[in-house]
């Protein structure tokens, strides 16, 4: 799981702009996002962990650490601001300490018991800076210095602040402020000459001098390829140079002196196991000291082990069933030199100085060997002093048949004395795998001394406490200073002791003599208060604080506040200013919703709710949806149990009058047509039809005025004319006879009754049912006075076809959603559809459409057959009438 730590320069110099118009900090943010996109192409990037550190003071510099997720990382990256100093050394130390936080707890470093390349936590630090001078509170620095004192326990066990699996890369932005006239050449990205370059090379990384956006993308692609699992090792040549590749031919081309391949500081790749995804190894790299059982502490180690190789050609040694570790070397001058020799059958042995008890160079623990195809160079890690051990083990199993003799045991014990004690554990596992489990006695001590073990345990506990403290401090904001500290002048005389001030004092008699005795030490704890930027000046308190061009505007505001006597507070902003919100705050609906009153309860909370089943394609659950409007967020929970097809009587606003222009000043024609058809004005109903499905009023105990208000549809009121006012409409309604209102107010029965008549819907009845309102109208006109007949028609038309059909549609939709194949009630309700033939056909088509949503095939088939029969009968009637 690679760790990718971005160290972003947030000094004030990052506010400079390139020729693209963007600041260096914006360029750095874009570079991080581009790197993440390029890295996401690799399937191995799923295990990446991203961290973010800035140039602020610790612990505020850590923006995203071990516990923060990807969303937090991106949010902190977006909110970075360039303000502060270029404290590169302190920030690098903070980054390294953050990476080393858990190493003592997990035991990755394995202090005193050899270095295990397969115990690693690969990390890459990518620093993005502008390469300016290093500035601190004490001044400007020319060289990069990392603080030596670290709060992390156990840091004294390693000489350097970094580890061998941590590499530092730097992107130094050198983008010019003006467009370059010269064309950019496609060459390699050069190293930068800033102070961070030597630090990068020490850790095994490098720096990039970025001079153009194209070069920046090239660097990011190179960095993505650098994300490899491995450790950095110093390879140094020990002894003379190797002889020429072909004997008898002198190597004329070889120059004298030190060569680049003599000392290389490169990475060895530690590949993870394809099955487990974790690297697997057997043998450590020896320590550079011989463990002393009497030593109370451990000597500090270098971050990168120094491995020396001998250029003497040797035969590679391998025996059956003895495990070994194989690591590929990163391309370097050393690998190039070995491959050019073209001798894959020979190898060079490797050593660690002072690893043996009496030998300064130590014994070999492996060898360097070119691959058979001469494509790479591999480091083979074997048991310590393997040229002695391997022949002994070979004789044990091939000659002695796993039954060691006394002479063999003496040779084996003498070998164990030359081997560091921490190799006993891996060696016991290896011989057990080979078939000799009792070869090494369990009583042999191969661990650390008691004092060292206690010391390491104590450091581990302290590191755990420090880790919890650092993790808990991540995300805390910098404490803002409440004022500016008053500091005494370090040089020069004070104002009161200057000669010019004394001359002025002699001229003027008003100057108090106390000024001569001023002592700045009395004001060491004083602070100058800062202005509150969020506090707006109350300019209406003083007319002279108002700019001249804003006098009329302020006068208008003050007049509006004065005239609004119902308000208990002064309103400092007008309506336009309330809606003048910065773009960055436009999407922040949470603060606005906190001030909105809670939504009203459901109209009928006792009504049973239909439970959603798993996999229901019609489920409208909006809990997980992102809402971009505050009003929708508030209004959403009220209607969450309604489908789009269901009418919501709760949201119908009240209307005062019927606004159909077709009803004004003219007698209704006998022909009956619906609003939907648009062919003519519909006839109002004055009496309820027998068996009519009556819509329920919203308020059962409301007055006549409120009943008419509730039942008027929204689209009716949109056609109001100026000659009909609400007061006039109310007067007309109140003066109308009571018997005119009874048919529309006595709607107390719901649509769920079963005594609605015959369930069979005939085509003839469907075609002729729309003529009934005219007969009802004629019978009603005989009993109603002529003075109020036109008024009643206007009112009852608003309560006629639209409301009845809406209620019928709601009931039919509920019946369609019910499981089963009992459709008699649907056809019964279809008998009572009001309006013209065209209105009824549209209504029937909507029912078929709703049935198709719920896959009611039998119902659809019956309704379509019924619809075809209607068209056929209608065509016959039209044909007869035309004849």
Swiss-Prot record:
Keywords: Chromosome, Nucleus, Phosphoprotein. It is found in: Nucleus; Chromosome. It comes from the Eukaryota. A motif (Inhibitory loop) lies at residues 625-632. The modification Phosphoserine is found at residue 800. GO terms for biological process: protein localization to chromatin; RNA polymerase II transcription initiation surveillance; snRNA processing. SUPFAM superfamilies: vWA-like. Disulfide bonds: none annotated. Its main location: nucleus. GO terms for cellular component: actin cytoskeleton; chromatin; INTAC complex; integrator complex; nucleoplasm; nucleus. It holds the Pfam family INT_SG_DDX_CT_C. Component of the Integrator complex, composed of core subunits INTS1, INTS2, INTS3, INTS4, INTS5, INTS6, INTS7, INTS8, INTS9/RC74, INTS10, INTS11/CPSF3L, INTS12, INTS13, INTS14 and INTS15. The core complex associates with protein phosphatase 2A subunits PPP2CA and PPP2R1A, to form the Integrator-PP2A (INTAC) complex. The inhibitory loop acts as a regulator of protein phosphatase 2A (PP2A) activity: Asp-628 and Glu-629 residues mimic phosphoserine and phosphothreonine residues and bind to the PP2A catalytic subunit PPP2CA active site to block substrate-binding. Belongs to the Integrator subunit 6 family. This is Integrator complex subunit 6. It comes from Mus musculus (Mouse).
